[in-house]
Amino acid sequence: MGYVINNNLLEQVLTLYRNKFVDTANNERVICRADEYFDISIGKTPPRKEPQWFSTNPQDVTWVSISDMGTCGLYISSSSEQLTKQAVERHNVKVVPNNTVLLSFKLTVGRIAITNGEMTTNEAIAHFKTDKKEINEYLYCYLKYFNYQTMGSTSSIATAVNSKIIKGMPFVVPTNDELEEFHGFAAPMFAKIKANQIETDNLTALRDTLLPKLMSGELDAFNIEI
């Protein structure tokens, strides 16, 4: 149910974006390189032959992969694999701030998510960092509609795109009035989606904790207080 609601909310935002910024021209918009507007960093993978840097303990540092971005929804808060804190420090893995837009650009190009909390990623993911957080909803939609085929030949797009190309990709900056209006509509929608995702994640975690205990008889369903 939450998935359907979130899809509907996101579709409303994408529809407004399409109407205002894709189907409607405005000569006052400025085009620049992405790295002229954002501080773009790239993730990292410690040496795989040294397993001490990797973990499957959710208490360790979240380390996002493209696979995680394929299942997370609009916001991402967890990963299937983690890094130890020592790995982040020793190998200088970039820590991504909360509420930062992520973009996959290797093998699977164009997956997008927004961080819910601080985390790290592997080297196939770019981080669009900015102090101007009101641009995030616009950036998310911009990347959703961006034609990644323009960044390499159709047959080799999965391998042709690299961090240099991502940093140099064109970014269309909306006018202040356009951004203020779009942010005013989109931000509450994104906040609702985030709240729904958190609630769903909490219910899923509760289910995963209780179900094995119920199945084993360790817990009695009639004595559970929710």
Which residue ranges define each predicted feature?
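Non-catalytic DNA-recognition/assembly elements of restriction-modification systems
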Residues: 1-49, 63, 67, 172, ...
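DNA target-recognition domains and sequence-specific DNA-contacting regions of bacterial/archaeal
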Residues: 32-174, 225
